[in-house]
């Protein structure tokens, strides 16, 4: 095997073109086996194998610095930079993250997981090199829809003024996670159709030199192109056309499904765990499609992650013009939603919690200052969500719940969620965000008659005394378990409260607890600092009521074990009962 003998880029440089092609085949075999067992980003990595080999053959990493956009396509890069064991041997699969990580290797320069940042980061490295009078190439690798993000445009705009070495490799596989959206991709299509010779060339218009490689899976052609731009004295774009999912037929034929994939059977391509039940994504799509048929002013918005709202290709087709994908442009999604709402439409934007960080300014300025009644559905906002350090969904409550005018809701069940969604779409007084519970969807069949227009009204779901437990959103279930544990130990039946609202407090209800409660416990599935519990603690600050806030401490977590994190933060029923006994 060639791959077993690759311990670093210097070993790649010893190979002939024929040997590199054999290496590429071995790398795909290893990637396929690993993905079938471990899951992960599939299509992007299969398409980048040859380009990665060619990059490491031509350039001198780490002296020459490579910055991968999103870095979800760095599996081949890691295989060639001393981390092959994490792809060859099952017992080492978890040795590396799914993204670039400077703690793993000197060949990685940033922790990266969000899109459209590579060109700006690479510009920074190039500027630092120039300030120090250094040499070496700086290479940004960008693709999979990342060019649709605003920061990519900003980076390209700045790059044209660098007047020093910067190489931007545009990996054009004609896909984002789903299909690409935006006028730029029409120009990429034109460039593909004309072998890069079209007069209308976006990159040249930005003031950048341009090289085209029609077969970005041809190692020889790639090596020639990279050699031609190595040590270039000004910024240049190398536009390579690759096949997403190359080498595995199911991935080549269904690029959207195979962008990221759960473990699967290699022969059939079918997932090892087949889930046919409802989840919040599928429920959202079905609800919105029904709503759209009755009301043509309802529109669903995504920023390149349509399936987070359950909008698979067939559902997008069914929705037609009432479904909008703005590309990887969260800022535009929120501003667009605000504009639609201002014009009398009923926009619903679905977004991962980790990605809503990218649009804080638009939430505050374009949406909430104008108090336009758009709906934002926030997914994977939980310790149970994505666990890579770049994709954590636990920071949303402190970040957005303190923006004036915004109403942030936290349902605990399917029924509550749909009731909140219906209210939010039909009301016209506030911008509203809904924090979708993570994990298995709970459906209790109870009809929700609550009118959410009367803001910040909590509900006592079980009346007790002495101890009150407020369980926010997905942690309401933990509140119920903690109450049972406390009662089994002390005989005290705790009062259980579903607060519904993250953005405000129910002063009347909280005041009433003072009469027969000594302790109030808050539980939230997110960061404590600046979070929901602190609002409750502040309310009781000058009283005799003791408040115990439970949530996650302020830190960056990476590839963590959920149960360990919960224990570290005393977020188990037993630990909560233990803490209470010490009061």
Regions found by a protein language model. Name each.
Residues 24, 41-162, 298, 303, ...:
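Cofactor-binding active-site loop characterized by glycine-rich and histidine/acidic residues
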Residues 248-357, 362-372, 470-473:
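Non-catalytic terminal/interface segments that mediate subunit docking, oligomerization
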Residues 29-36, 97-111, 133-139, 312-327, ...:
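Glycine/charged-rich beta-loop-alpha catalytic/anionic-binding loops adjacent to active sites
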Residues 19, 28-31, 42-47, 52, ...:
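Cofactor-pocket helix-loop regions in the catalytic cores of large enzyme subunits
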Residues 39-48, 68-72, 101-120, 142-146, ...:
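Active-site nucleophile and cofactor-binding loops and adjacent substrate-binding regions
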Residues 86-96, 161-175, 368-380:
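A glycine-rich helix N-cap at a beta->alpha junction
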Residues 272-274, 385-387, 407, 527, ...:
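Peripheral docking tails and interdomain loops at the edges
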Residues 108-264, 270-277, 281-286, 406-517:
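Glycine-rich ThDP/TPP pyrophosphate-binding loop and its adjacent helix/strand module
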């Amino acid at each position: 095997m060639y791959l077993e003998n690759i311990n670093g880029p210097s070993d790649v440089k010893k190979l002939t073109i024929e040997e590199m092609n054999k290496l590429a085949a071995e790398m795909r075999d290893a990637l396929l086996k690993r993905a079938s067992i471990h899951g992960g980003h599939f299509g992007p990595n299969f398409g980048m194998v040859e380009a990665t080999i060619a990059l490491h053959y031509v350039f001198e990493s780490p002296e020459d610095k490579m910055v991968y956009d999103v870095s979800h396509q760095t599996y081949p890069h890691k295989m060639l930079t001393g981390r092959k064991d994490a792809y060859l041997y099952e017992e080492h699969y978890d040795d590396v993250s799914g993204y670039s990580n400077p703690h793993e290797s000197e060949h990685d320069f940033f922790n990266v997981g969000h899109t459209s940042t590579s060109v700006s980061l690479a510009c920074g490295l190039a500027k630092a090199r120039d300030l120090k009078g250094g040499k070496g190439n700086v290479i940004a690798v960008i693709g999979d829809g990342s060019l649709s993000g605003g920061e990519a445009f900003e980076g390209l705009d700045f790059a044209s003024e660098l007047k020093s070495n910067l190489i931007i490799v545009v990996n054009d596989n004609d896909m984002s996670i789903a299909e690409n959206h935006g006028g730029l991709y029409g120009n990429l299509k034109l460039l593909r159709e004309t072998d890069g010779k079209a007069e209308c060339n976006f990159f040249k218009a930005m003031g950048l030199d341009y090289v085209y490689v029609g077969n970005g899976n041809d190692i020889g052609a790639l090596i020639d192109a990279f050699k031609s731009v190595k040590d270039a004295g000004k910024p240049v774009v190398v536009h390579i056309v690759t096949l997403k999912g190359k080498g595995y037929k199911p991935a080549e034929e269904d690029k959207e499904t195979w962008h990221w994939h759960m473990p699967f059977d290699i022969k059939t391509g079918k997932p090892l765990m087949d889930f046919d039940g409802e989840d919040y994504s599928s429920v959202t799509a079905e609800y919105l499609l029904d709503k759209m048929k009755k009301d043509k002013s309802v529109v669903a918005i995504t920023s390149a992650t349509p399936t987070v709202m359950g909008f698979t290709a067939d559902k997008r087709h069914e929705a037609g013009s009432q479904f909008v994908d703005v590309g990887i442009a969260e800022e535009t999604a929120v501003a667009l939603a605000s504009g639609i709402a201002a014009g009398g439409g009923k926009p619903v934007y679905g977004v991962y919690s980790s990605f809503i960080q990218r649009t804080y300014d638009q939430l505050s300025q374009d949406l909430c200052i104008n108090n336009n009644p758009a709906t934002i559905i926030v997914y994977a906002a939980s310790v149970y969500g994505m666990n890579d350090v770049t994709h954590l969904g636990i920071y949303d409550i402190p970040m957005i719940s303190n923006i004036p005018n915004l109403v942030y809701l936290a349902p605990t069940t399917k029924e509550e969620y749909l009731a909140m969604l219906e209210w939010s779409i039909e009301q016209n007084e506030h911008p509203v965000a809904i924090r979708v519970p993570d994990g298995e969807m709970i459906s209790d069949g109870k009809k929700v008659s609550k009118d959410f227009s009367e803001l910040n009204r909590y509900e006592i779901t079980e009346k007790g005394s002495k101890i009150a437990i407020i369980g926010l959103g997905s942690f309401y279930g933990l509140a119920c378990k903690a109450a049972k544990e406390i009662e089994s130990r002390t005989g005290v039946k705790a009062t259980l409260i579903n607060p519904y609202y993250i953005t405000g407090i129910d002063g009347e209800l909280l005041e009433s607890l003072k009469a027969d409660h000594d302790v109030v416990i808050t539980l939230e599935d997110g960061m404590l600092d600046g979070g929901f519990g602190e609002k409750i603690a502040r309310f009781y600050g000058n009283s005799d009521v003791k408040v115990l806030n439970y949530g996650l401490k302020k830190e960056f977590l990476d590839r963590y074990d959920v149960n360990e994190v919960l224990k570290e933060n005393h977020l188990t029923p037993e630990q909560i009962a233990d803490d209470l006994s010490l009061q």
